Amino acid sequence: MSKNSVIIVAAGKGKRMNSSISKQFLQIKNKPILYYTLSKFSTHESIDEIVLVTLEDKIEVCGDIIDKYNINKVSKIVPGGKERQDSVYNGLKAVSKDCEVVLIHDAARPFVTSDIIENGIRYTNQYGAAACGVIPKDTIKIKNEKGFAIDTPNREDLFIVQTPQCFNYNIILSCHEKLKKHNKKVTDDTMVLENYGKSVYLYEGSYSNIKITTPEDLILGEQILEKLT
């Protein structure tokens, strides 16, 4: 029977947080951010396994969090790579071979909802690839190299992409292998498919599905958690 697997990418160092502690290990309400992220997927009935990708020297720390909070479905903890795309590739190689849909998610994005996860799987089964996100609230400007505004895109045509980003496993693995062979750089996994002419369906995420990257995000995260509990 085919599986739905999730790769949690927790290999970032969080330089923008101005902290010696990696952002995924910082705490909200006395629990690490990683706990909230892992628990969202481990308790979701459509998720069969979790592969956690982290810094090599943090594998033991992650294992302790998993044990302390009795988090299920984590099949492997694997070391990350130099860049995020290398970490994702390591995760892709570690998932079960009977995986059909793989979700790739930021460890520092702890407020993903059950509906976002379920819709990602559903749309991937329908279209082969899907990513959640939101329409920007602010007006977006395009500027030239001198710093002057030259265009104002219609906000309805713009999309702030979040995670999870969800894919047919064989498609995303094949594209990552090509990316590695051609030595191309990307900033997220939808770009991996775009590089090879594949389309990604974009569906509604949530403005609360933030990635915690700055001290201000930690404060906002506490407020979001209070509303959710």
Curated annotation (Swiss-Prot):
Keywords: Isoprene biosynthesis, Nucleotidyltransferase, Transferase. The record marks 16, 23 as: Transition state stabilizer. One of its GO terms (biological process) is isopentenyl diphosphate biosynthetic process, methylerythritol 4-phosphate pathway. It is an enzyme of class 2 (transferase). The record marks 155, 211 as: Positions MEP for the nucleophilic attack. Its EC number is 2.7.7.60. It catalyses: 2-C-methyl-D-erythritol 4-phosphate + CTP + H(+) = 4-CDP-2-C-methyl-D-erythritol + diphosphate. PROSITE patterns: ISPD. It holds the Pfam family IspD. GO terms for molecular function: 2-C-methyl-D-erythritol 4-phosphate cytidylyltransferase activity. PANTHER family: 2-C-METHYL-D-ERYTHRITOL 4-PHOSPHATE CYTIDYLYLTRANSFERASE, CHLOROPLASTIC. Catalyzes the formation of 4-diphosphocytidyl-2-C-methyl-D-erythritol from CTP and 2-C-methyl-D-erythritol 4-phosphate (MEP). This is 2-C-methyl-D-erythritol 4-phosphate cytidylyltransferase. It comes from Clostridium botulinum (strain Kyoto / Type A2). The gene is ispD.
